[in-house]
Amino acid sequence: RAYLNNPETEIAAIAVRRPETAQAYQKSLGFSCAVYTDVAKMLHEADLDIVSICTPPSMHPEHAVAAAQAGCHLVLEKPVALNVEGFRQIRAAVDAAKVKTVISFVLRWNPLFETIQALLGAEAIGRLFYGEVDYNHGIGPWYGQYRWNRLKAEGGSSLLSAGLHALDALRWFVQKEAVEVFAYSTNSMNLELYPGGYEYDPTMVTVLKFKDGVIGKVASNIECVQPYTFPITLQGTSGTIRNNQLYSKKLMPGQTGFATIPTILPDSGDVTHHPFQHEIDHFVQCIQLNVESHANLVDAAKTHEICYAAELSAAEGRPVRLPIL
């Protein structure tokens, strides 16, 4: 839908496993295009400038490398790859082809995120020294993706499956390089609610050390029994941001409690709630202006290496120094 709404783009082709899926999309959205069941054939035959890769994560390296080698710019769903090797394969292909990329850390375009960035830029809470962002979203059989997301070979880890949205948010707010990671993980084995169970620990807490002494925490829980939440806390030398609430001794010295900012929060796990239109509009403009996206593959490597390091830390019970990617 985002491509249809952008006046500079049109959908030229879709590659799917089942043609009827593409036909249903075309009918519901009112457009027509070529339909393929073979990605390589589509890349060879169709006249494409941008390829959006929304396949299961284990397929990303194969599809992203092929699209980059075909000279296409990439919109790549997260996780980019489930391991360091897969990420490096994609990065090498992108570097060689000199194509542009945007990774779908789509919450960077959420209005609350934009508001928080403006507040941090204005030093509303002074110098940031602590931040935490959590991801709480029970992903069970009521979501179609559960059948593959629960598998180690496809979901990867709690962070790679979904929690990296929170991890990327923390990085986006802190704006400093992470230097060390320590993580713990667990699995409730709630087989009544999550039949078959997760093959990896769906609950993980990750503690991070950034340059210049900033520390942070990310909890990722995709087996929780509660409504979706994405809590944010950022503490600085002059105040605190707590979701859409601000306490700022600098801006409001007479303040006696948190002030609430009316805005759109990241309070739904439903992808229709996410600002994909802003992401696609941003990427099209990046291509037209020949500039890199702030959410490109280079930046995404810094979020993904924390995920890989957290998984290693939880498995071996030790801190992991960065970089590893």
Question: What is each model feature region?
Answer:
Residues 1-30:
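N-terminal Rossmann-like dinucleotide-binding module
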Residues 76-77, 82, 101-103, 218, ...:
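Hydrophobic residues in well-ordered beta-strands that form the structural core
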Residues 89-106, 126-131:
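Rossmann-fold dehydrogenase core element
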Residues 107-197, 317:
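Predominantly a Rossmann-like dinucleotide-binding segment in NAD(P)-dependent oxidoreductases
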